[in-house]
From Swiss-Prot:
Name of the protein: Maturase K
Species: Gleditsia triacanthos
Family: Belongs to the intron maturase 2 family. MatK subfamily.
Biological process terms in GO annotation: mRNA processing; RNA splicing; tRNA processing
Gene: matK
Places the protein is found: Plastid, Chloroplast
GO molecular function: RNA binding
GO cellular component: chloroplast
Family annotation (InterPro entries): Domain_X, Maturase_MatK, Maturase_MatK_N
PANTHER family: MATURASE K
Main location: plastid
Amino acid sequence: MKEFQVYLELDRSLQHDFLYPLIFREYIYALAYDHGLNSSILVENLGYDNKSSLLIVKRLITRMYQQNHLILSANDSNKNQFWGYNKNLYSQIISEGFAVSVEIPFSLQLISSLEEAEIVKSYNLRSIHSIFPFFEEKFPYLNYVSDVRIPYPIHLEILVQTLRYWVKDASSFHLLRLFLYEYCNWNSLITPKKWISTFSKSNPRLFLFLYNFYVCEYESILIFLRNKSSYLRLTSSGVLFERIYFYAKIEHRVEVFDKDFPSTLWFFKDPFIHYVRYQGKSILSSRNTPFFMNKWKYYLIHLWQCHFYVWSQPGKIHINQLSEHSFYFLGYFSNVRLNPSVVRSQMLENSFIIENVMKKLDTTIPIIPLIRSLAKAKFCNVLGHPISKPVWADSSDFDIIDRFLRICRNLSHYYNGSSNKKSLYRIKYILRLSCIKTLARKHKSTVRVFLKRLGSKFLEEFFTEEEEILSLILPRASFTLQRLYRGRIWYLDIFYFHH
């Protein structure tokens, strides 16, 4: 390790350019074990002490440079041994260590950017539900919406080259190429999805980092052009596509792109366009005509094709009118509903009738997909009729009731923002009867007999959760105000969403 000591003692501002020595540090793998791998399983499986683990990792990296087949393909056996050790497991160790190392400079950049902008960290902004108040505020004034699914996979060589622009460490990315070589069709411009699936399952941390970096790079270009388009002008659409291709070939991309772009497309000038993304799905909405939305649509397609070499079909990006079509996002169907109202006004002896139309965001629960999910989990059949869950029949009564109540509360917690609660009540009804049938099956009784023995208090537990939350939030509020809040509530403590 003495030969790497000179790199590790560099100035803190320059250390992000030398990530390769971090791969040989013991604590990096300790972090990887905490986040991903189980250290107890490693010790049992590998049979080595922690003092010799670093030596084995160094040997594996050296062997990788000599032979490009340390990482096994999907058809190879997981039991093959390399110096008496599991190949796939060690490749996972190194990939986890690399992922932890390469995340360090981006974390430092994020912290410094927050400090420079004096942005106060708020956990409420991390909530998935925080996007829906934004929809309620902005979308009633917009006209068109487009569902955009970010295409993947991109050519991994393009991804590595882009990553090298942000982290200037050639040695680390030579190692990254060796990892990716066995998981993709290197001679093809479009990586087969089956290789991506294999890579994401065996190296989840590294895969998530690479995917998030790809999305970040795509959005940085999108935001840059969006900010430039508010005051610049151009008359030819062909220049944009040439600039994108030119932009991909320039070493100092952002600086050159900024200087060499004295004018941006005037027909992108749209101060009322909004962009929202969660994972691989994004929403693009505007208040202008479909002409502007189509320009953005074809711009995105050419951006993916010319810069990331990803093929995307224009027919898969649909532009719909918000007042006539719903868009599906984060488990809700949302659209802008027209709410007409009539007001009678009287001035002296004359009376007037004023008709007014208010636009309001309407969010509904996708009842059919939810019933399909419940049917797949054996809570009901495909028609939505509740059935017993025999897998849980061996558990105690308390555990069975607790499991059903937990699922019911989670669904109620997430879908309490629906404009119409009938679908939510139907889901809770299915879970309630499924719980009763499971208990009746366990005790070899009928549902009617079992309900008589339990009483009506058991059923109330499935419906009183909302009222308990409201009583905590609004302890002194009037019944009318509580009823108003009962219409739609967004919670800011939901940080992830299971599909």
